[in-house]
Design a protein with these regions (language model features):
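Active-site glycine-rich loops that stabilize anionic/oxyanionic intermediates
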Residues: 22-25, 92
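Active-site loop/oxyanion-hole signature of alpha/beta-hydrolase fold enzymes
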Residues: 2, 7, 38, 44-93, ...
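Conserved alpha/beta-hydrolase catalytic His-Asp/Glu region
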Residues: 123, 127-131, 141-191
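Short substrate-entry loop that stabilizes the transition state in hydrolases
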Residues: 26-28, 121
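Short beta-strand element of the alpha/beta-hydrolase
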Residues: 14-22
Length: 191
């Protein structure tokens, strides 16, 4: 599936483990993790449209205006590769994408491993999402006006490892490789 730059490792007929990256990253974020599972699982890595080696011409602002479009891509990968009994590992926004995919086709998934998920980023009465609506609006405006500058400033802060600046640099590079159109659609799903 060239749209999502799907790559496989591990046991060809083993239980599938699909590893899905978060915003601003690509399948390479899993490079240190997947080898630990390759002797037992069929490892399936991919890039969301707009990230890594995905087909950027496949980006459709209407399809990807909500997470359902990304969940449909996950299901298309599973269908094309005949993946069943899937262990889906989703980081950040991909955790929610995995939940949506599993809700549509629960028979396809054995387990969901949700790494750093947040169903909603905006604080509300009785709920801590981590941001105010103003925070999110400011973030989106910054993304739209200066994506590369935002990437360079935010990546080290997101990593939070001042003693390992190479991690912030790696995330900055990952953000800079991503198609900046992708996060802009999130205005429609910010609440």
């Amino acid at each position: 599936m060239s749209r999502n730059h799907v790559i496989e490792h591990g046991v060809p007929h083993g239980q599938p483990m699909v590893l899905a990256h978060g915003f601003g990253c690509d399948h390479n974020m899993w490079r240190s993790a997947w080898p630990a599972f390759a002797d037992r699982y069929r490892i399936v890595l991919f890039d969301h449209v707009g990230a890594g080696g995905s087909d950027s011409s496949a980006y459709d602002p209407h399809r990807y205006a909500s997470l359902e479009g990304y969940a449909e891509d996950v299901l298309a990968i599973c269908e094309e590769r005949d993946l069943r009994d899937v262990v889906f590992v989703g980081h950040s926004v991909s955790a929610m994408i995995g939940v949506l995919a599993a809700a549509q086709q629960p028979e396809r998934f054995a387990r969901l491993v949700l790494v750093g998920p947040s169903p909603r980023y905006i604080d509300d009465e009785g709920y801590v999402g981590g941001f105010t609506r103003e925070d999110i609006d400011g973030l989106l405006e910054s993304l739209e006006s200066n994506y590369l500058g935002w990437s360079s400033a935010m990546a080290p802060a997101i990593m939070g490892n001042a003693d390992r600046p190479e991690l912030g640099e790696e995330l900055t590079n990952s953000f800079c490789r991503a198609d900046p159109r992708s996060p802009r659609t999130s205005r429609a799903r910010r609440s």
